[in-house]
Amino acid sequence: MSTGLADNVRKYRRTAGLSQEGLAEAADLSLSTVRKAEQGGHVSMETLHTLARALGVSTSTLFATDAPKSVLGKRDEANRRYLAELRRALMPAVGLSAPLSDPGEAGELSELRRGVQEGHALYWADQYGAVAKRLPGLLRSSEAAVSALEGEEQEHAMIARCHALLLTGKYLTQVRQYDMAYFALVEAIRLAREAHQAQLASTGVVGLCWLLLRQDRFDEAEQLAAQTAREIEPRMSEATPAHLAVWGELWLRVASAAVRNNRPEVAREARRMAAAAASALNTEDESFPHHWGGFGPVTAELKAVEDLSLVGDTRSVLRRTDDGILSDKSVRNFGRPTAPNWGRHRLDVAHAHVTLGSHQDAMDELMQLRRTSGEWLTHQPMARYVMADILKTRKRTLTEDMRSMAAHLGVAG
C-alpha cells in the first residue's frame, strides 16, 4: 500500500477522534490490520472499504497517487508475447503518414457479425485462448471494411467494427489487460456515436464502467453510468428488451460503484431502478452486442446479494442465495444468468462459507466453478482470497482438493 494511502487512513482516523484500537473496534477488524494499513502494508480493497465505512468517508477518499510497484516477472513477459498480435491489430504503430500495419482485406459484414457472435460464444464457454486468436482477424477485417465502403454501407461497417471492439474490450477486461481494454471500449463508443447508435454506445459505456470498477475508479464509474442511464431512460411501455437491459445494466454499475465507495443510499436507489428494469423485462436476456451481458430479475438479485457480501453480512448472503428469486424454481422460470454473473455469485457464497468457518462448503463451491469455468476462475481475485483464507485458517490437514485448487489458483500455503 502507498505511503499516501497510509497517511490518509491515519488522517481520517484522527479527524474522527479515534485511536487505532477505536478504529479497529468500529470497523470490526483486528488491531494489527489497522496498524498494517497505517504503516503502508498491503491490505485488500475489501479492508479499505471496511475502514472507509467505519470512518464515514468514501472509499476513494482514502486513495493516493504513488509510484506503481514493479510487475516484472515470467507471467508479465509471457502475457506480452501472448497478446502481441492482438496488440498490433488493436493499437497499430502510427507515424506521420499511414499506419505501419496492413489492415488486410475487408470482410463481408455478415461474416463479421457472425464472427463476433462465434467469438462471444467462445467467451461464454470459457475458451479464452480461442477468443484471443480470433480477435486480431476481426479487428483487421472490420477496419478494412470501414475504409473500403461508403455511405450507408460504411455506417453498417462501423457498427460491425463497433461490435468487434466491444467483444475485444470485454475479453481484455476479463483477463485484466486494462489499458488495451480501455482503448477498445472508448473506440467502440466513439464509433457508435459517430454512427448515431445511442444504445450501442450505451452498451460500450456499461463495459467501460465495468473496467473503471476493476480499476477502483468508483466516482467516475458511478457518475458515468448514472449520467448515461438518465440520458437513455426508456418509456417502460414502449421499450425494447435490449433497451431495458442496457438501462438496467447501467443502474447495476451505479450500484456496484456506490456500494464499494461507501455510498449506501445511492446504491439502494440504483438497485431499485435496476429491479424496475428487470421486472419490466421479466426474463433473463443476454443478447450481446445489443447490450453488454446478461440482465434480468435473477441477475439483479445476484448483484443485490453481492452488496451484502461487500458489507460483510455473510449470514444474509447464505440466507438469500437459494431463496425467493434465486430459488431453483424462480431461476428455471426467469432463466439462468450468464456464467460469469452466476460464478461471481457463487464466489460470494464461498466467501460467506469460509468467513463462517465452513471450509468444506467453500471448497464445494470452488470445485464446482472449476469444473464449469476453470479458466474464468483463475482470473478472479475473490477465488484466491477464499482459497488463501482456507489455507490460513484450516487447522486440519489439507485435502487433495484443497491442494489442487491452491495450485490451480496460484495460491501458496
Where does each model-flagged region fall?
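DNA major-groove recognition helix of helix-turn-helix/homeodomain DNA-binding modules
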Residues: 28, 46-61
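Short C-terminal boundary/hinge segments that cap the last helix of small helical domains
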Residues: 56-71, 300
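Short, charged recognition helix plus adjacent turn
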Residues: 65-94
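The alpha-helix within a helix-turn-helix
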Residues: 13, 24, 52
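Recognition helix of helix-turn-helix/homeodomain-like DNA-binding domains
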Residues: 28-43, 66
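Conserved binding/catalytic microenvironments
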Residues: 104-413
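A short, Lys/Arg-rich alpha-helix, primarily the initiator
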Residues: 1-15
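Conserved hydrophobic/aromatic packing and binding residues within compact polymer-binding modules
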Residues: 9, 20-24, 32-37, 62
